[in-house]
Amino acid sequence: EKKKPNCKIMGIGTKNYGSCNGIIYKNRSSVDYFKQVAEIEDYGYILLNQQWKKAWGGDYIDLLTPAMTDQNHVRVFTDDNRYISQDCRHLTPAGAQWYAQILDWKNIFKEKQPRYQ
């Protein structure tokens, strides 16, 4: 099927919130529980995100970078202390709401410019 005129196709990035929420949950009694971050143990996620970002250019929705706190750590909790992901891969409703607040929707849905003229 052909793409409809004025239709915008976007690449949507990968996500990774550590290897197991149990690692975070076991520290639930600590004072800084909600400040914990998770390590991205598989660097392939970061490389894949970089490759897709380069390939898709302005038509890429990067979900990994906004969650990163440094080169290989990501947030686990939203600003209101709710889990972003229940299983380290899929978003909780709170995680989806967090992304809805932080992503630049005006930029994502701006009118598409032709790649080649």
Which functions belong to the PLM regions below?
Residues 1-117:
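Extracellular glycan-modifying ectodomains
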